[in-house]
A protein has these predicted regions:
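Beta/alpha (TIM)-barrel catalytic core signal, keyed to glycine-rich beta->alpha loops juxtaposed to Asp/Glu
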Residues: 3-192
């Protein structure tokens, strides 16, 4: 069971506070309804928030956003590296989201819905096989990562699975992604 959408400290406080989602998840685990409890979150604060979450509770898994563009940001990278250290110390699983996120949808402003776009995602995903292959290869080349969540549109699933089977070296993946002038953090504008 993953506590979802815990991407900042206010959300973490709600989830881990009295009467929060964590209490229900732990109860479900104690009753044998779930084997493990993890945490997931979106946004540029997610790695720092998930580090704090691991200080509060021994989550079995952490699912945090990671891709090449996100790790280019020095602050994000530092938070991510500290999270990786703690995940290793606690022997938790580290999974990623946003591996194939290309950028925000063009013409969708902060707080606006992304409905009507080509895919059922709130960000624009890569949708060309070679770009997906590069993005998946780049993420999975990091040994701390135990898995990735696919983009939220089933039409991309086959390309993501194929990308995993046909991975390219990290250097080639990085070069392929760097050639996309529109590659950007999907967290520049968050949807409603």
């Amino acid at each position: 069971l993953q506590l979802h959408a815990v991407g900042d400290l206010a959300e973490l406080d709600r989830a881990t506070g009295s009467g929060g989602a964590l209490e229900a998840a732990v109860r479900a685990q104690q009753e044998g309804l779930v084997a493990a409890v993890g945490i997931t979150g979106h946004g540029s604060q997610a790695p720092a928030t998930h580090l704090e979450a691991l200080r509060r509770f021994p989550f079995a898994t952490v699912m945090t956003p990671v891709n090449q563009k996100l790790l280019e940001d020095e602050g994000f990278r530092g938070d991510y590296e500290r999270l990786v250290e703690e995940v290793r110390r606690q022997d938790a699983g580290l999974m990623t989201i946003k591996a194939v996120a290309r950028r925000n949808w063009p013409h969708v402003g902060a707080g606006e819905s992304a409905s009507g776009q080509a895919y059922a995602t709130w960000y624009e995903p890569y949708d060309e096989q070679e770009r997906i292959r590069a993005a998946v290869s780049w993420v999975l080349a990091h040994p701390e990562i135990t898995g990735l969540a696919t983009a939220g549109d089933v039409r991309l699933l086959g390309m993501i699975v194929r990308a995993e089977r046909e991975r390219m070296p990290l250097e080639d993946a990085a070069t392929a992604l760097q050639t996309d002038a529109d590659y950007a953090s999907p967290f520049l504008r968050m949807p409603a």
